[in-house]
Amino acid sequence: MVLTNFFLRKKTSTTASIAKKRLHIIVTERKIDNTPELNYLPKFKKDLLRIIHQYIHEPKKISIQLQEQDNNAYMLQLTISFLTKNQDLINSKKQDNTTV
C-alpha cells in the first residue's frame, strides 16, 4: 500500500518550479506589452561618442543610427568616415609646414 501511495501521490511544487513559473509569467507579460526597454541607449550612445571623439576630432565623420528590426529587435549602426592615405599625407605635411 505504501508503495502505491508513493507513485500515485501528487508531487509538491519545489521552489525552483515556482520560480520558473513566475519567470515564465513575467516573460510572457513583457512580450505582450511590446514596450522596448531601451532606457540605456542614450547614455550608451553618449559614451560611445565620447570614446570615438578621443581619436576622431571631426564630428561630421561620425554617424550613429538606431534602427528597429523584426520582432522588436533593434540595431545600433555606427559609421565612421576615415581619410585615405593620400589625404593623411597631405594633412600631415600641412601640419609639419605650420609647425616649422
Curated annotation (Swiss-Prot):
Keywords: Cell cycle, Cell division
Family the UniProt entry places it in: Belongs to the MinE family.
UniProt-listed NCBIfam families: minE, PRK00296.1
Designated name of the protein: Cell division topological specificity factor
Species per Swiss-Prot/TrEMBL record: Blochmanniella floridana
Role summary: Prevents the cell division inhibition by proteins MinC and MinD at internal division sites while permitting inhibition at polar sites. This ensures cell division at the proper site by restricting the formation of a division septum at the midpoint of the long axis of the cell.
Entries under Pfam families matching the protein: MinE
InterPro entries: MinE, MinE_sf
GO biological process annotation, one example: cell division
Domain of life: Bacteria
